[in-house]
């Protein structure tokens, strides 16, 4: 790859983000300032105009540019009509849970008319991350990218931004309210999108706005791919081209060249595209994003759309367009589980001198967390006094180790900080279920049919090495995201985890370093991390309907003995509940 070619190619996507480009990371200060204004904005997609929450009137929202180790100050002004919080997804926020963002976990929400200043501390992150709302389903439209360049004095060549995001043709707030009230499943979105557009396979009114990427033959581009979807894993491919993955979740990987990627909600990937079509080739190629799902498609509604954008060669070395763009024939089918697993098993940490691998070899705390879809009895939240819309008149729920998380009325971090956690949360989240459950492929995977609500947390001493094995008992994949930490994905397997046999298969040499791991249906995934970030840290499935149903818990990491191992003081401007 010729290094001289890269800089001339940076601007075809970045030029539209004028405010971000005005602060060039190569010359900017180490402290960067942004103002986010939450507002209601009218947008048209799929021939319908609707009012959505946006940041600075943009959908997707503004991109934050920084360098590794920078300090970012974001003042969020809530000019919308509802409470809101913002989470900086994948930023570890060392010693600073106060600015992590999940509502009622680390802060009370920002009320309409209020504002809150977030302090975002970048440490080891380098590559692509993103920010999003962390309240109800607001992240459907309130989200944007975080582009983290290397430290000053160092370089890397991969700099082109592309994002993959969802679009809802039904009112998001109505969808969520209905699901909460009557306990049924959440209505699926009408389409997937790439950079806010569904593509030209949808109604005529959408075609003129199809996202297009202009490329020149022989050059190499970096796609910063973000799955901001609420409920779907995605396959992504570009017709006539292979893709080289060089990073995931802002951590470098050993380069792998593939025909497609599979990316879970919440994940980010840095992917190289070589524009290698030659004279006589078509000059237009679809990049396509398609839902990957393991649910029974004949009985459960889901978004089965394929979003498209167009890669278009603009130089004379390639023929001008004749007919429609080519479609990626190697894009996997919706239920291709083998294709999904084949991709994720290839991921490895880079592991060089500048980016070493430090996998903990000795584990202090072993946890086996069963992930399941359950039910709760229909209750007074159903204002119609009719049966709920879940199976057998119940409401849908979800659980970790048969605990369906219930949000408290005040935020947990404040309660912990002031020593007033009694009555707010319980410090007894179980390390494992007492009954061994085998995945069955039924609707609730053979786990407990009915679950119980609770606000249970796991308390860890500072420096504890933790291994968590996620055991998926359900018929659906689950992207599990941990705030405050990046972890090593040391193992995967199908069926029931065997604590005597399966650890021997772990990769302790160069496992991928991630903040979100996709746990396949009826399978398991093992992660390891060192609890060296004091504070309260949320862990949850990144399917938003599962968060609402209770597939969440928290780690409370105690302060260490030195000042550098203790939480930062509480900021004076924290929102009040």
From Swiss-Prot:
Coiled coil: none
EC identifiers of the protein: 1.10.3.2
Protein residues bound to Cu cation 2: 89, 132, 542
Broad EC category: oxidoreductase
Boundaries of every Plastocyanin-like domain copy: 37-153, 163-316, 442-561
Cofactor: binding details: Binds 4 Cu cations per monomer.
Predominant location: secreted
Reactions accelerated catalytically: 4 hydroquinone + O2 = 4 benzosemiquinone + 2 H2O
Residues that coordinate or bind Cu cation 3: 134, 483, 540
UniProt keywords, alphabetically: Apoplast, Copper, Glycoprotein, Lignin degradation, Metal-binding, Oxidoreductase, Repeat, Secreted, Signal
Gene3D superfamilies hit by this protein: Cupredoxins - blue copper proteins
Record-listed Cu cation 1 binding positions: 87, 481
Record: residues binding Cu cation 4: 478, 541, 546, 551
Glycosylation: residue positions: 42, 83, 115, 276, 304, 382, 402
Cofactor(s) this protein cannot do without: Cu cation
GO MF annotation terms: copper ion binding; hydroquinone:oxygen oxidoreductase activity; oxidoreductase activity
Pfam family, one: Cu-oxidase_3
One GO BP annotation of this record: lignin catabolic process
Alphabetized PANTHER family for the sequence: LACCASE-14 (PTHR11709:SF262), MULTI-COPPER OXIDASE (PTHR11709)
NCBIfam families registered for this protein in UniProt: laccase (TIGR03389)
Family to which this protein belongs: Belongs to the multicopper oxidase family.
Identification of the protein by name: Putative laccase-1
Organism: Oryza sativa subsp. japonica
